Amino acid sequence: GQLIASAVVWAFIYWVKPLGDHMTFTIVNPFIKDSYLYIGAIAMFIFIALVMVGSSNAVNITDGLDGLVIVPVMIVALVLGIVSYVTGNTIWSKYLNLYYIHGVGELTVYLSTMIGAGLGFLWYNFYPAQIFMGDTGSLTLGGVLATVAIFLKQELLLAIVGIVFVIEALSVIIQVWSFKKRGKRVFAMAPIHHHFELQGMPETKVTARFWIITLMFAILGILILKLR
């Protein structure tokens, strides 16, 4: 399913070419203005698949404590919403030296509804949770964030702002690799939020600190676009 979704996204940018021929199959460097790497159609499909599969599964892995995943998802959606509005506005995109994409500002509306729905979900998902997201919700939300980032040419920015998702996924990869190669575990338990729990940190404290980390990197992501 994730690869099919990746193929659909790739086909869309291949035929629609919202950024024109010269930018369709490129990766944009968010740290440097006017810095991008052309990788071609085939490599772009592989890259899109990695982003889609990585994002959806990373968000899914993070969904292990009450309220842990939905707030970072909303924060990332907020940042992408700001970027989509700026990118779809000729004046602001020129001011920040971002590539203008016609009509992409409509994604701001979609992301806003996503944030609103997330707040409603958080009302009942905060500790002690009454409802749970499940794989259907977490995989979908991760895929949505990846799709929006791909349309905005901000895949690397997604990795920065969604640093909590990256850390959670890496903790699982490191744990599995270490156990298979060395016969030893790096963490008491993976994903890493369970490691902190086993170290004696209350669930609510783990959740709150992950929220704070996401907020810090969200601010960093916005500053990167302005100060680069």
Region locations from a protein language model:
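PP2C/PPM family metal-dependent serine/threonine protein phosphatase catalytic domain
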Residues: 29-38
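Membrane-interface loop-to-helix entry segments
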Residues: 1-4, 66
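Alpha-helical transmembrane segments
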Residues: 7-30, 43, 47-48, 52-58, ...
